[in-house]
Structures are given as C-alpha cells and as structure tokens.
A protein has these predicted regions:
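Substrate-binding cleft of extracellular glycoside hydrolase catalytic domains
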Residues: 123, 132-171
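A substrate-binding/cap region within the structured catalytic cores of diverse enzymes
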Residues: 159-186, 193-214, 221, 225, ...
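Preference for extracellular/luminal or secreted protein segments
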Residues: 17-93, 314-315, 324, 343-499
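Generic enzyme active-site microenvironment
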Residues: 70, 135-136, 236, 333-334, ...
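A short aromatic-anchored loop/beta-hairpin motif
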Residues: 93-104, 291-292
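Flexible hinge/switch segments at interdomain interfaces of large molecular machines
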Residues: 149, 191-199, 240-246, 284, ...
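Second-shell residues forming the walls of enzyme active-site clefts
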Residues: 60, 83-84, 109-128, 132, ...
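Conserved functional hotspot residues or short segments at active or partner-binding sites
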Residues: 1-22, 388
Length: 499
C-alpha cells in the first residue's frame, strides 16, 4: 500500500464520517422542529389512551353532561316508586345518567329492592350504555334507607365504642352496610357523615356525627369507608367542608361558618385529610357559607341581587382547597340541589352551572323527577349546562375532568364492567338482614352503652333521651333513673330530667 493510497483512504473516511455527522444533525434538527411544533400546537407524541380517556373522547357533550347528573325517582305520579315502569325505563335508557339516588320510599323489601336496581341497570346498559352508580344514604341510626337491612346504631354510638375498641366496630358496621347494599346492586353509599359535632344547637347533624373529637371522627370514618370498599361499595365523606358547627339546617336555610382556614384544618377539615389519605372516592359538598374562604358574590337570576356563594358553588373551596391543596382526586358530588340552602336563592340552571365551574363533578337531584311532565324542567337544566359549555362559561376541560373522575371511579369499582349475572336474588336474600349481621348489630349496640356516674346535682342539669328502653320498664334500672330525678314519659322511655 503506497502512501498516496493511505492519504486517499483517509480522505474517503473523513468524507464518510462527515456524511454520517451531517445525517445525524439533519435528524436532530427534524426532531427539534417536531418537538417545537408539539409545544406550540399543544400536541404530544402519540401515547396510547387509557380506557377512560378513550371513552371520554368518544362521548357527545350531551352524554357528558347527563353523566354528571344524579337523579331521583323517589315517587312516580304521587306513588312510591318501587317497581320499574315503562316511563321510567325509557327515561333511563334515553338520558345516560351517571347516577341514581334511592330513598326509603324506593327500597322497602329485599326482593323488591333487588328487582328495582337490576331493572335500572338493565335500562342504563341497553345498547351499550354505561352502568349507573346507584346510591342511598345508608348511614345507620336515624338516616336509614334499606327497609329489610340490618338496623345499625348511628355514628355517635360508634363513637361511644372508640375508647375501648378503637375502630373495630366502625369497620364492622361499614362491612355490614357494604355487604347488604352491594349484594342488592346499590354500589354507592352517601355516607359516612364526617362532620365534627362541635355545636350543641345543631338541628341536623347531632347523632349522625361520630362525636366532637376530630381525630376520632377521621379514624372511624376511614374504617367505615374501608369496610364498605371490601364489597366494592363507594363511600362518601360528607358534608365538605363541615356541617357540624351550625345552628341552621341547610334543608331549610343557608347556614354560615365564619372560621379561619387554620381553625378549619384543626377541626372540620381534619377528618377529610384522613379520608383522602385512605383513598376516599367521593366527597359531598355542604350548602353552607364560609365567608373567610369564599367572599365572592354573584347576581342571582332568581333574586336579582348579589348573593354570597356557599361551599357547593365556591371555586376557592372546591377546586382551590379540596382538589389542589388537599389533593382529592375522586368525585365531588353536591348535596341535593333542591334543598332550601340553594333553591331559595338560585334558579336551577344557574346553580348547576356555577357549581360545575367551581369544581363539582356530579350534581345530586338538580330537579324533582316524579312524573313525565318533570322532564321539561330536566331538559332545561341539561340544555342550560350545554349552552354554558358551548359559550365558554364552563370550560370543556372542566367537563372532561368531571366525567373522567366519574368514569375512573366506575372503573375502579367494576361498574364499567357491570354484569347482571354477578347478582342473584338468592344471594341477596342470604345476606340482607342475615343472622350474622343482626348478631353484630347487637354486639355493637352493647359496646356502645355508656355509663354516667352522677355526682351531686349533675343529673339534674342534663336533658337525656333514652331510645329503645321498652325492656326496662318497671325494672330496677328504670327505678334508679327515677330515683336520680328523671321524669320518664312514654313506652319508649323518653326521659326528661328536671333542671
């Protein structure tokens, strides 16, 4: 090999290397240009969509909006709605509702309840429709919907078991509720109440609360939610940010809680922090004013005046506090929108639009739906929400986020894969109100019994209500109460102690 050949080979090698470098640089420039285009136009390199993302992308705007509604058929044509009829079946088939709420008027007996929920899901899933979140307020105690179910004591009784038993009985109660609802096809429970009972004049919470200790309330609520989740029943913490420290019932008026965020974090919000850490999937809002957290006012179409925004309609509270600061990724559902706390001051369309803007994902009972004529009002609400999306009042991203949250919970709880063959009447009859559940009910009630030791004149300062003491009439225990100054009235032993 001559020297000239070596030089020539070197030149050729340099040319080849230069060509390779040029090719690499061309490719790099192309990649950079494509990446810049992605950033400019908001697109990203293709990533496979999740199942839920694909479903949301393929849904019409109307179907997205109706998926954000939880409706009730509490009665139909002035009669309790307990058996599916052709009118309601057609409504469910046509509207693609996300959820239906049931009341005691709807679920009286096991076989009847089973047949009703199965018929609802059959109508909802016809022709490829999405299965429903079917809910009830099965709190236990005074708020109790399932007529044939196990009649568990209320939350305050569970609170009474906490000192000696920790969260044991709250978990067992959650399991009983979850097993009985779930086997009937009721896959959502609008419970537990996680309000802290820190106002003795509260007319609506009281015994529905676990108690006045925020830490205890959070732990018991988390245990109850975990028990329900074992049976794929969605638990709901309510009423955010807190309905405990009020003297007004939001069913009949608009309460106010005037507290700083620091104070709320120590009391009202503490149980929600625990519930969110435990993976709670649904939180219900409160129709309550929180002026230190939301000071904005909006002119109401109903009153013609500027009205303060309750938590249900507050962006600062629902999006800023609950979703962003507290990290909640589940479904925000309203309390019933026909309650006076909302309905007295806002028309139905405006209240729903503002609530969705604020961060609500699921609207509970936007209007009554008790006869065929009520559909006109429902259509007005749906059309009003659609119009608000189309004119930009409600961003499409907000709607997509809401529907994504709803479908994600449905996917996680197996509702998207609903199969009627997973349910049988025989299974339901074997579980609802079964002997094992009744035995746990009695054990829980016994564990909740609390003794009070009276020291001079203490009893005389208390007003006490004993419920279910019919077995104590004419017994030594009752004589002891009377001897302590109690005045006993009635077979149910409602006792009123003289002050």
């Amino acid at each position: 090999i001559t020297g000239s050949n070596l030089v020539a080979d070197g030149i050729n090698n340099d040319r080849g290397m230069n060509e390779m470098i040029d090719s690499f640089l061309d490719g790099l420039n192309t990649f950079k240009a494509e990446r810049e285009a992605c950033l400019i136009y908001g697109s990203e390199p293709e990533v496979p969509m999740t199942r839920v993302e694909q479903m949301v992308a393929e849904m019409s705007l109307r179907d997205k909006v109706t998926q954000m509604l939880m409706v009730d058929f509490r009665d139909w044509n002035s009669k309790d709605f307990t058996v599916m009829n052709d009118e309601v079946r057609q409504i469910i088939e046509d509207y693609n509702f996300g959820s239906i709420i049931l009341f005691a008027d709807n679920i009286k007996e096991t076989e009847q309840s089973y047949n009703l929920t199965m018929a609802m899901q059959e109508a909802a899933t016809k022709d490829g429709g999405l299965a429903l979140i079917i809910c009830a307020d099965q709190e236990g105690g005074s708020v109790y919907r399932l007529g044939s179910g196990t009649a568990l004591p209320g939350n305050m009784a569970l609170g009474a078991t906490y000192a000696n038993n920790g969260t044991k009985y709250a978990y067992e109660a959650g399991k009983i509720i979850g097993s009985e609802l779930g086997i009937l096809g009721i896959n959502g429970n609008l419970a537990p109440v996680v309000d802290v009972n820190n106002n003795a004049n509260n007319p609506v919470i009281g015994l529905r609360s676990y108690g006045d200790d925020a830490t205890m309330v959070g732990e018991l609520a988390a245990a109850s939610i975990a028990g329900m989740a074992e049976y794929n029943v969605i638990g709901t913490a309510k009423h955010f940010p807190g309905h405990g420290d009020t003297a007004t019932d939001s069913h009949y008026g608009l309460p106010m809680v005037d507290k700083s965020l620091d104070v709320l974090m120590e009391t009202e919000l503490a149980p929600y922090t625990v519930a969110i850490e435990q993976g709670i999937e649904m939180i219900m809002t409160a129709h309550i004013l929180y002026p230190q957290q939301e000071s904005d006012k909006i002119v109401s179409n109903k009153t013609g005046k500027e009205e303060s925004l309750p938590a249900t309609m507050s962006d600062d509270i629902l999006t800023g506090l609950l979703k962003e600061d507290m990290g909640f990724e589940g479904i925000i559902v309203t309390d019933a929108m026909n309650m006076a706390g909302i309905a007295d001051k806002w028309d139905q369309v405006q209240s729903c639009v503002i609530a969705i803007q604020a961060g609500v994902d699921l609207i509970c009972m936007p209007c009554r739906l008790y006869c065929q004529a009520d559909l006109a009002n429902l259509d007005k609400i749906i059309d009003g929400i659609i119009a608000a999306v189309e004119d930009g009042t409600i961003p499409m991203e907000r709607v997509n986020d809401a529907v994504t949250r709803i479908l994600t919970v449905k996917e996680n709880r197996g509702i998207l894969d609903y199969n009627a063959e997973d349910y049988t009447l025989e299974k339901a009859q074997a579980v609802v109100g079964c002997d094992a559940n009744r035995e746990m009910e009695r054990e829980l009630a016994a564990a909740a019994v609390t003794g009070f030791i009276a020291k001079e004149n203490v009893v005389g300062t208390l007003a006490v209500c004993f419920v279910g003491l019919e077995n104590l009439i004419d017994t030594e225990e009752l004589a002891m109460l009377e001897g302590a100054g109690a005045e006993v009235a009635g077979v149910l032993a409602i006792t009123k102690v003289a002050a």
